[in-house]
Amino acid sequence: MKKQNLIDMEGTVTESLPNATFRACLDNGCQVLTHISGRMRRSYIRILPGDRVRVELSPYDLTKGRIIYRLRSRHTNNSQ
């Protein structure tokens, strides 16, 4: 269940840090420290630098966030 007062933004993962923590650059240019949500941990979704992600931010601390979704890449490999 999503909380009402969270800010939802998109960005790109720039760096992978220990303990499922990542540094991401949001579309507005801000750098945030993010971690993976519990649902993504349970589903074993891998996040790599360069992936597009959707991040939830608290209005009280805009430097930390939670990755809630990994967006699909636009590039498709047709040479199966």
From Swiss-Prot:
PANTHER family: TRANSLATION INITIATION FACTOR IF-1, CHLOROPLASTIC (PTHR33370:SF1). Keywords: Chloroplast, Initiation factor, Plastid, Protein biosynthesis, RNA-binding, rRNA-binding. It is found in: Plastid, Chloroplast. It holds the Pfam family eIF-1a. Residues 1-72 form the S1-like domain. This is Translation initiation factor IF-1, chloroplastic. One of the essential components for the initiation of protein synthesis. Stabilizes the binding of IF-2 and IF-3 on the 30S subunit to which N-formylmethionyl-tRNA(fMet) subsequently binds. Helps modulate mRNA selection, yielding the 30S pre-initiation complex (PIC). Upon addition of the 50S ribosomal subunit IF-1, IF-2 and IF-3 are released leaving the mature 70S translation initiation complex. Belongs to the IF-1 family. Component of the 30S ribosomal translation pre-initiation complex which assembles on the 30S ribosome in the order IF-2 and IF-3, IF-1 and N-formylmethionyl-tRNA(fMet); mRNA recruitment can occur at any time during PIC assembly. InterPro entries: NA-bd_OB-fold, RNA-binding_domain_S1_IF1, TIF_IF1. The keyword Chloroplast applies. Its main location: plastid. GO terms for cellular component: chloroplast; cytosol. The gene is infA. Gene3D superfamilies: Nucleic acid-binding proteins. NCBIfam families: infA. GO terms for molecular function: ribosome binding; rRNA binding; translation initiation factor activity.
